Amino acid sequence: MKEKIPFYNEKEFHDMVKKTKKGTFSGWYIINKNNNSVEFSGSFNRQFKLNKPVIPVNTEYVTRKEFNEYKDSNDQRLTKIETELKSQGQRIQVVEDKVDRLTEVVMVQSQQIKTQGEAMNARMDRFESLVLKSLESIGNTLTDFGKRLDVIETRLDKIDPPK
């Protein structure tokens, strides 16, 4: 006796056996991957032949009180998640404010650095001009000393002619 029952894989078949608790068979089965079915050989109970799990008689129904407790616990979890999200949002807002303040400080400092750089460039230009003037004056004094030395040498030559 062969019968094909649509289970998609071995795990699904075993899950079905666990769900029904009454599903028993004796024999073997082959999972056919081409048409996604399981091929059985052996004897089955009615439950597996129909491929419908039978709800056990001892199933408990949920009472209104249990449902309300479940609903309340879900509401509590949701409110907890909401408060966590709000607190994280507040922390994010604080961090954004700090970042904004830091960007303002960076902008102010960059402006200060620019003005200091311009002032430094002006000082360097002035220093350069002063150095050039001092070098020029030193050069002039050296030429004056050279002229004076020439004058002194000519006078010495006149006083004491070379032999």
From Swiss-Prot:
- Classify the source by domain of life: Bacteria
Question: Which Pfam family, any one, appears in the UniProt record?
Answer: DUF16
Quote the InterPro entries the UniProt record gives: DUF16
Give the signal sequence positions.
none
The record's family statement is:
Belongs to the UPF0134 family.
Q: What is this protein called?
A: UPF0134 protein MPN_139
* Organism of origin: Mycoplasma pneumoniae (strain ATCC 29342 / M129 / Subtype 1)
